[in-house]
């Protein structure tokens, strides 16, 4: 595939989600200055992955902005949170190791996610060591909380297991984990989202502002959950313009 590096996982089983983690790298046109990059984590409730409209379909947009798009096919946790977390960390590590080859800036690698993939992205943004913290985070209709009041039950069970303690749920409710190392954020969602309630985003945005972390949040009047790059999302053009404008602020 043109402008693509990396390998595609073989033997993907959609029912068992039995595959090796992989990345597909889309590089922008060559320039004298090293490019920024973004690791993209598709959603799917930690039970499957929406690789197209929450993954590969975003590569042209980022390449047009001069940003490398690195789409991550991460493994499902099945109750073991370390599995997808380690895949995300390894993607960042691998991108840094290949920064010279890909002409990207190793200090300007961000992370992006959708729904449960946004929980993974925000977990990396709040839990990673300083060495692996992303430079920015982009979250679409994110699962943020693992607590029963606001959290997405299916994602919580898949990520933490059936018998997760309240203490463990709080540890991975990322509105509680924002600190001075947490990167700037772009958050977008729909007001009528019934899949992942808007309070996830609102609480995370509030936590970022309490720590004086730069953040922008856009709540569209309608659209529900899971629109990604779909043409059917009524506010798609506005969303892309706002994301483009945000990316130009740093």
Question: Where are the regions a protein language model picked out?
Answer:
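Mobile cap/lid helix-loop segments that gate and shape the active-site cleft of serine hydrolases
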Residues: 8, 142-177, 183
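N-terminal cap/lid segment of alpha/beta-hydrolase-fold proteins
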Residues: 1-32
């Amino acid at each position: 595939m043109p402008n693509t590096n990396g390998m595609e996982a073989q033997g993907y089983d959609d029912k068992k989600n039995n595959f090796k983690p992989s990345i597909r790298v889309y590089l922008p046109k060559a320039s004298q200055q090293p490019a920024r990059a973004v690791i993209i984590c598709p959603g799917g409730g930690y039970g499957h992955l929406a690789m197209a409209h929450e993954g590969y379909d975003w590569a042209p947009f980022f390449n047009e902005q001069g940003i490398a798009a690195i789409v991550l096919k991460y493994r499902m946790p099945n109750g073991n949170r370390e599995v997808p977390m380690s895949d995300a960390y390894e993607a960042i590590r691998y991108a840094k190791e290949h920064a010279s080859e890909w002409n990207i800036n190793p200090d300007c690698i961000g992370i992006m996610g959708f729904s449960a993939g946004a929980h993974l992205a925000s977990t990396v943004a709040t839990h990673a060591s300083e060495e692996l913290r992303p430079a920015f985070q982009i979250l679409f209709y994110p699962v943020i909380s693992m607590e029963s009041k606001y959290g997405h039950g299916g994602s919580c069970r898949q990520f933490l297991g059936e018998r997760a303690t309240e203490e463990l749920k709080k540890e991975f409710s990322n509105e509680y984990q924002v600190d001075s190392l947490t990167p700037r954020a772009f958050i977008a969602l729909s007001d009528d989202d019934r899949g992942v309630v808007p309070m996830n985003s609102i609480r995370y945005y509030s936590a970022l502002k309490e720590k004086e972390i730069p953040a922008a949040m856009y709540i569209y009047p309608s659209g529900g959950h899971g629109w990604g790059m779909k043409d059917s999302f009524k506010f798609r053009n506005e969303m892309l313009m706002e994301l483009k404008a945000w990316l130009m602020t740093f």
